């Protein structure tokens, strides 16, 4: 399985896509790169409310205080959006996550204006849930 790119490479790759069909395919590819989420982590505590699709996000804090994220969805495009969020929050502490605004990155990728309203709401729900959980750990 290929590793996820860093923030800058994600943005470059996104900008290299010729059209939105290519961007959607790239988002799906990113989702396919996520590590498999085990069945024990697919429970209501890790479920994200406000998403039309099933979404699970697991947050664990490692010994260095850095948050490690795992997630999955039953929808390919949503799984790709999870991957994008994970790329943006990669190697951050809980306080870093609380303080970091992902919206400028979404604007640079022109991401939200090309998502359906329900997917945009689901993306916002994921971000709110991650930030809320990070706030309890910081």
Curated annotation (Swiss-Prot):
Family: Belongs to the SufE family.
Source organism of the structure: Citrobacter koseri (strain ATCC BAA-895 / CDC 4225-83 / SGSC4696)
Pathway: Cofactor biosynthesis; iron-sulfur cluster biosynthesis
Lineage: Bacteria, Pseudomonadati, Pseudomonadota, Gammaproteobacteria, Enterobacterales
UniProt-listed InterPro entries: Cysteine_desulfuration_SufE, Fe-S_metab-assoc_dom
Family matches, as Pfam families: SufE (PF02657)
Catalytic residue positions: 51 (cysteine persulfide intermediate)
HAMAP family: SufE (MF_01832)
Role according to the record: Participates in cysteine desulfuration mediated by SufS. Cysteine desulfuration mobilizes sulfur from L-cysteine to yield L-alanine and constitutes an essential step in sulfur metabolism for biosynthesis of a variety of sulfur-containing biomolecules. Functions as a sulfur acceptor for SufS, by mediating the direct transfer of the sulfur atom from the S-sulfanylcysteine of SufS, an intermediate product of cysteine desulfuration process.
Cellular compartments annotated: Cytoplasm
UniProt key word Cytoplasm: yes
Self-association state and partner proteins as the record states: Homodimer. Interacts with SufS.
Keywords: Cytoplasm
Entry's Gene Ontology BP terms: iron-sulfur cluster assembly; sulfur compound metabolic process
Predominant place of localization: cytoplasm
Alphabetized SUPFAM superfamilies for the sequence: SufE/NifU
Assigned GO CC terms: cytoplasm
Name of the featured protein: Cysteine desulfuration protein SufE
């Amino acid at each position: 399985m290929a590793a996820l790119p860093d923030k800058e490479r994600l943005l470059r790759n996104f900008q290299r896509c010729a059209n939105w069909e290519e961007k959607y395919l790239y988002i799906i590819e990113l989702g396919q790169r996520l590590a498999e989420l085990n069945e024990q982590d697919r429970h209501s505590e890790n479920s994200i409310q406000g998403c039309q699709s099933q979404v699970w996000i697991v947050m664990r804090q490692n010994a260095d205080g850095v948050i490690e994220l795992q997630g999955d969805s039953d929808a390919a495009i949503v799984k790709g959006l999870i991957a994008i969020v994970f790329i943006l929050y990669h190697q951050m502490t809980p306080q870093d996550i609380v303080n970091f605004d992902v919206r400028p990155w979404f604007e640079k990728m022109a991401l939200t204006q090309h998502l359906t309203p329900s997917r945009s709401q689901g993306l916002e729900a994921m971000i709110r849930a991650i930030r809320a959980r990070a706030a309890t750990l910081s």
